[in-house]
Amino acid sequence: MYEYIRGQFQGISKDYVVIELNNIGYRIFTSGNTMSNMPKVGDEVLLYLEQIVREDFIGLYGFTTKEELEMFKLLLSINGVGAKAALSLLSISTVNNLKYAIMMGDEKHITRAPGIGKKTAQRIILELKDKLKPDELTSEEEQLIEGINDNSDYSFNINETLSALMALGYTEKEAQKALEKVDKTLSIENMIKESLKLLMR
């Protein structure tokens, strides 16, 4: 079992990041939230890990915060929710907003995640609502409750930008290389523009 990894950030793909440690590159699957918090290539980063072992697959899943890792584990505890679906849920909004959606029974917010239908959303709400206690939320988090859907798209930015660049004819490798040099806090439109400037040099 692994607790965390600390190493150099070396790249990003649609659903994973590459972290180099002792000259070994680790492919670590992660959410849009964690991707949006990645530093510049070559900078050090720490990810909290969960290893998933199946008969035909062994994978590492990592997150920049323990809170997101714990939410990932909670989602995996639900029947019918696998790692891919859990990452999808953690990519539609912040962990806090996802908590709010579950506690408030907001099926609409939860079904925004690709691959999550109404029945799965209902199961998530039913099984996790009581596990997410109000005392886990800070006063600052409570102030955000009215805007649960307002800013939940930002974690899609990286994946959407990569997809857009590839749709324009660039390879995944070319798109990734350009995106690594772009400010990830920008909007999708501006990330695409900045990436294109780099690609057209």
UniProtKB/Swiss-Prot annotation:
**Region Domain III, annotated ranges:** 153-201
The GO annotation for biological process reads: DNA recombination; DNA repair
| UniProt KW keywords | Cytoplasm, DNA damage, DNA recombination, DNA repair, DNA-binding
Just give the chief location class.
cytoplasm
Task: Outline the segment boundaries, as ranges, of region: Domain I.
Answer: 1-64
The domain of life for this entry's organism is Bacteria
Q: Where in the cell is it found?
A: Cytoplasm
Family indicated by similarity:
Belongs to the RuvA family.
> What does the comment on domains in this protein's record state?
Has three domains with a flexible linker between the domains II and III and assumes an 'L' shape. Domain III is highly mobile and contacts RuvB.
Tell me the subunit arrangement.
Answer: Homotetramer. Forms an RuvA(8)-RuvB(12)-Holliday junction (HJ) complex. HJ DNA is sandwiched between 2 RuvA tetramers; dsDNA enters through RuvA and exits via RuvB. An RuvB hexamer assembles on each DNA strand where it exits the tetramer. Each RuvB hexamer is contacted by two RuvA subunits (via domain III) on 2 adjacent RuvB subunits; this complex drives branch migration. In the full resolvosome a probable DNA-RuvA(4)-RuvB(12)-RuvC(2) complex forms which resolves the HJ.
**Cited HAMAP family:** DNA_HJ_migration_RuvA
Q: What does this protein do?
A: The RuvA-RuvB-RuvC complex processes Holliday junction (HJ) DNA during genetic recombination and DNA repair, while the RuvA-RuvB complex plays an important role in the rescue of blocked DNA replication forks via replication fork reversal (RFR). RuvA specifically binds to HJ cruciform DNA, conferring on it an open structure. The RuvB hexamer acts as an ATP-dependent pump, pulling dsDNA into and through the RuvAB complex. HJ branch migration allows RuvC to scan DNA until it finds its consensus sequence, where it cleaves and resolves the cruciform DNA.
Indicate what this protein is called per its UniProt record: Holliday junction branch migration complex subunit RuvA
Q: Look up and give the organism this protein is from.
A: Clostridium perfringens (strain SM101 / Type A)
**Gene designation:** ruvA
